[in-house]
Design a protein with these regions (language model features):
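Active-site- and interface-proximal helix/loop "cap" or "latch" segments in soluble metabolic
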Residues: 8-92
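Short acidic DE-rich linear segments
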Residues: 92-98
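Short, hydrophobic/aromatic-rich segments at coil-to-beta transitions
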Residues: 1-6
């Protein structure tokens, strides 16, 4: 079953990421804001990948002097999803919102 999430980024130029996950795989990802070409590129590269692999590849990437980045924020969101954690930064959204 596909589940859509909206994650509020912290410390990045992009404000949110919409993630659709099904059976442990990232179906789609869409960033709101940020560097348009880069965030679209990241989303295209990880589409269809197992979330564990996405986390491994993106976790800890920094943007300049910032302690995080748009890819790192995706890894943080997917870690929360994988662990079934609920935070104010992550919410399940309906298909209409997705």
């Amino acid at each position: 079953m596909k589940t859509a999430y909206l994650y509020k980024n912290q410390g990045t130029c992009s404000s949110h990421i919409k993630l659709v996950v099904e059976d442990g795989r990232l179906v789609t990802a869409e960033y709101y804001g940020g560097c348009n070409g880069n965030t679209k590129g990241i989303a295209a590269l990880v589409q269809g990948m197992p979330i564990d692999e996405v986390i491994t590849r993106l976790e800890g990437i920094r943007c300049g002097f910032k302690p995080t980045s748009c890819p790192d924020q995706m890894a943080k969101a997917l870690t929360l999803i994988k662990n079934g954690e609920s935070t104010p930064s992550l919410k399940i959204i309906t298909e209409e919102e997705a």
